[in-house]
Amino acid sequence: MYNQEVKLTTKEILEKEFKTSMRGYSQDEVDKFLDVVIQDYEVFQKKIERLEQEIHQLRTEAKRAASERQTRHQTSPSVGSTNYDILQRLSNLEKKVFGNKLYE
């Protein structure tokens, strides 16, 4: 997971003032570059928010699936014994209705 803190916000980048000197950088060029950086920051922030929502949703789904799996696992033995009981009853009824002809 990404543990480093973001040092700048889009607002801080936008409001940053640079000192000018005799042979300094072109102010327009710096402003254009910072505009690009701000746009990238906004895109990254939106991606981070979307991915955090997706992580939350997937974790919720995983918990629900695990809970359903556990519930199914707990009820499956009783279903198996119920099926066995039904088959045993059916066998007894067949013996009574058809006699021992089926089992000869």
UniProtKB/Swiss-Prot annotation:
Write one Pfam family the protein is assigned to.
DivIVA
Q: Where is this region: Disordered?
A: 60-82
Q: What residue spans carry the Polar residues bias annotation?
A: 73-82
Q: Which residues form a coiled coil?
A: 34-72
- Biased amino acid composition, Basic and acidic residues: 60-71
Q: Where in the cell is it found?
A: Cytoplasm
This protein's GO cellular component annotations are: cytoplasm
> Mind listing the GO biological process terms from this record?
cell division; regulation of cell shape
Keyword tags: Cell cycle, Cell division, Cell shape, Coiled coil, Cytoplasm
By its UniProt entry, which InterPro entries does this protein fall under? Cell_cycle_GpsB, DivIVA_domain, DivIVA_fam
Family indicated by similarity: Belongs to the GpsB family.
Binding partners and assembly:
Forms polymers through the coiled coil domains. Interacts with PBP1, MreC and EzrA.
Matches recorded under NCBIfam families: DivI1A_domain, PRK14127.1
Q: What is this protein called?
A: Cell cycle protein GpsB
Give the source lineage, highest ranks first. Bacteria, Bacillati, Bacillota, Bacilli, Bacillales
